[in-house]
Amino acid sequence: MKKFDKSIAAFEEAQDLMPGGVNSPVRAFKSVGMNPLFMERGKGSKVYDIDGNEYIDYVLSWGPLIHGHANNRVVEALKAVAEKGTSFGAPTEIENKLAKLVIERVPSIEIVRMVNSGTEATMSALRLARGYTGRNKILKFIGCYHGHGDSLLIKAGSGVATLGLPDSPGVPEGVAKNTITVAYNDLESVKYAFEQFGDDIACVIVEPVAGNMGVVPPQPGFLEGLREVTEQNGALLIFDEVMTGFRVAYNCGQGYYGVTPDLTCLGKVIGGGLPVGAYGGKAEIMRQVAPSGPIYQAGTLSGNPLAMAAGYETLVQLTPESYVEFERKAEMLEAGLRKAAEKHGIPHHINRAGSMIGIFFTDEPVINYDAAKSSNLEFFAAYYREMVEQGVFLPPSQFEGLFLSTAHSDADIEATIAAAEIAMSKLKA
């Protein structure tokens, strides 16, 4: 049995200092029934907690670390930038360098604005869509997470397409009423929503792959249908690629699925492990953003040289060949997990998109949030705890997917499959 004495003590102290002892809710490990692991360091595919335990890491800071921990080129770039100054409140050339890479690789982006988080990117994109179209309502999908902006913390009421109700105290009902929610992968509900409210829908915002349901890819024709419906009704299509951007493919989710939105939100990978976000799209739309246009958005640390340097060094190391290797590794891990579950007769469904993998303990195909919720959460929690004992660090939530990095070796994947085999053999009874 691993010892976690130092992590337990650190969490006890943290609970007197921060809400729930953490600075982001999922880090509290509540859904898996254990104390959070306090990390001390990471290198490559491995992380080490303050008790000295080593883990193969599939959290990767919730996706940004596509080259693993403490990537040499990223670290050296950060050192070089920090020695010259961490932030100036003025433009720097490194902003141009990262912006050029983003524009070259993302089909929808002609102009990009850097911000500090994925939430900031989606909030800004919604304001831009409303300002550009002169409309008020947005349409989002149940179970798709787009950050913690008021317009996006909304759950559905009854019916296939309803005006939303707040999903968190503090979200005004007046704000929520401008958010329409429908089921992910349900194109007919989208069409119905446009029949009811189409003249006032500014945009549809969607994750090309629903990452916060535990990895749920789009059904064939779904994204294409969204593109068609929005064009027919004069609404903008926004892809939230904070999670999928540069992870599922060299040209992001939109390149992977061959559907080009009007606006794209980015984050995670483009910061190389530092706080960052971005939104971009057609020049005609993006030129409405201040100071080119009247739609305001600003940020003290937006485009700061540390984040830009880390993002640039992260992206330049990604080539089309990188994604061929990601596909090979991800297929290997997916097949191994499936084989382990089948061997022990454990109900399961595995989804994958590029280097994102989600395993659900259910017989039901997982194509939307309701199906994701059918997973056996108690079994997942027990599986999670056993995987920790076996030295594998997974996202501590059923509704988060695994991420692979260029640093993961075949030996890492083989060890992970062996750990899953042990975990499932212990839990099958």
Curated annotation (Swiss-Prot):
PROSITE patterns listed in its UniProt record: AA_TRANSFER_CLASS_3 (PS00600)
Task: List the pathway annotation.
Answer: Porphyrin-containing compound metabolism; protoporphyrin-IX biosynthesis; 5-aminolevulinate from L-glutamyl-tRNA(Glu): step 2/2
Name the reaction it catalyses. (S)-4-amino-5-oxopentanoate = 5-aminolevulinate
Where is the protein situated, by its record's location annotation? Cytoplasm
Does the entry feature the keyword Cytoplasm, yes or no?
yes
Q: What is its EC number?
A: 5.4.3.8
N6-(pyridoxal phosphate)lysine sites (modified residues):
K268
GO CC annotation: what is one? cytoplasm
Keywords for this protein:
Cytoplasm, Isomerase, Porphyrin biosynthesis, Pyridoxal phosphate
GO molecular function terms attached to this record = glutamate-1-semialdehyde 2,1-aminomutase activity; pyridoxal phosphate binding; transaminase activity
Q: Which cofactor does it need?
A: pyridoxal 5'-phosphate
Q: Which CDD domains match?
A: OAT_like
Classification via InterPro entries: 4pyrrol_synth_GluAld_NH2Trfase, Aminotrans_3, Aminotrans_3_PPA_site, PyrdxlP-dep_Trfase, PyrdxlP-dep_Trfase_major, PyrdxlP-dep_Trfase_small
Q: Name one GO biological process term.
A: protoporphyrinogen IX biosynthetic process
Q: Which EC class is the enzyme in?
A: isomerase
Give a yes or no for keyword Cytoplasm in this entry. Answer: yes
The UniProt entry, under HAMAP family, shows: HemL_aminotrans_3
Q: How does it assemble?
A: Homodimer.
Family (UniProt): Belongs to the class-III pyridoxal-phosphate-dependent aminotransferase family. HemL subfamily.
Q: What PANTHER family does this protein's entry cite?
A: GLUTAMATE-1-SEMIALDEHYDE 2,1-AMINOMUTASE, GLUTAMATE-1-SEMIALDEHYDE 2,1-AMINOMUTASE 1, CHLOROPLASTIC-RELATED
Q: What is this protein called?
A: Glutamate-1-semialdehyde 2,1-aminomutase 2
